[in-house]
Swiss-Prot record:
<comment type="similarity">
    <text>Belongs to the UPF0173 family.</text>
</comment>
<dbReference type="GO" id="GO:0016787">
    <property type="term" value="F:hydrolase activity"/>
</dbReference>
<dbReference type="InterPro" id="IPR001279">
    <property type="entry name" value="Metallo-B-lactamas"/>
</dbReference>
<dbReference type="InterPro" id="IPR036866">
    <property type="entry name" value="RibonucZ/Hydroxyglut_hydro"/>
</dbReference>
<protein>
    <recommendedName>
        <fullName>UPF0173 protein YddR</fullName>
        <ecNumber>3.-.-.-</ecNumber>
    </recommendedName>
</protein>
<keyword id="KW-0378">Hydrolase</keyword>
<dbReference type="Pfam" id="PF12706">
    <property type="entry name" value="Lactamase_B_2"/>
</dbReference>
<dbReference type="InterPro" id="IPR050114">
    <property type="entry name" value="UPF0173_UPF0282_UlaG_hydrolase"/>
</dbReference>
Length: 254
């Protein structure tokens, strides 16, 4: 498999000879307003440019996976540039309805037993923050596990914090590669929305032999954990050899 960090949560996964585009936010730097109740209110999103052209990103894509419909995972540019007949996977019927309303004709809801071109796609749980108020505000999210006889097991956790269900997913699926959204993006009033460094350390402790790739970093205004801080923390805690913190455009092959 090959995993390319594009920007924020947008990644390209080549797995069992198929190309998946996950959580496409494809706008130019500074297109959108800041998120409310967050730091850096003077900056527009995304904070950085794409590392390559949209044509390069879309070239040869077999399917798109949208873990949830927040702007930094599925934006207006993605809705406009993606072919309307491309295979789209979403987390539930509500998201399917919205994606279809944007003109997409080949939309499927992920389940535990979804299969695409011989690749098993297992929908996994997630919680987009902590506390009832924040969870109600942020709405449902998912991750997914990729499985195929010719590949290692890949777990893409999505927009979630560490909690017991993530540990359960790791123990159930025994992933060898885990992609976490690790920028510790926060609301000033309600706290962390995704994983911070301590969450990522818990992922490592639950899967000590897995390679962890941390994405969703330094690309939208409400990030609080930098790549540099995460790298330093992983050295302090002794798991730097297990974690990869890609720059935008960087690729890994497993």
């Amino acid at each position: 498999m090959n995993i390319t960090q594009i920007r924020n949560a947008t990644i390209v996964v080549k797995y069992a000879n198929k190309k998946f585009l996950i959580d496409p936010m494809l706008a130019e730097k500074g297109t959108y307003a800041t998120f409310p109740e967050t730091i850096r209110q003077d900056l527009f999103n995304p904070l950085v440019s794409l590392p390559t052209s949209i044509d390069n990103i879309l070239d040869g894509v077999d399917a798109v996976i949208v873990t949830h419909l927040h702007l930094d995972h599925f934006d207006d540019v993605a809705k406009n540039v993606l072919p309307k007949n491309i295979k789209m996977f979403v987390q539930n019927e509500a998201d399917a309805k919205e994606v279809k309303a944007s003109g997409f004709k080949n939309v499927e809801v992920l389940h535990q037993d979804t299969v695409f071109e011989g690749i098993q796609l297992v929908k996994t749980k997630g919680e987009h923050g902590r506390g009832e108020e924040l969870l109600n505000l942020m709405g449902d999210v998912c991750g997914l596990v990729f499985k195929h006889p010719s590949e290692k097991v890949l777990y893409v956790a999505g927009d979630t914090v560490w909690y017991d269900a993530i540990e359960d997913e790791i123990h159930t699926h025994q992933p060898e590669i885990i992609v976490v959204n690790g920028g510790d993006n926060q609301r000033l009033d309600l706290g962390s929305l995704i994983m911070g460094k301590e969450d990522i350390y818990e992922v490592h402790k639950a899967a000590p032999h897995a390679k962890i790739i941390s994405v969703h970093m330094e690309a939208v205004n409400h990030w609080t954990l930098s790549r540099e801080e995460l790298k330093n923390f992983s050295k302090e805690k002794g798991f730097s050899s297990n974690i990869l913190v890609p720059e935008d455009g960087e690729s890994y092959t497993f």
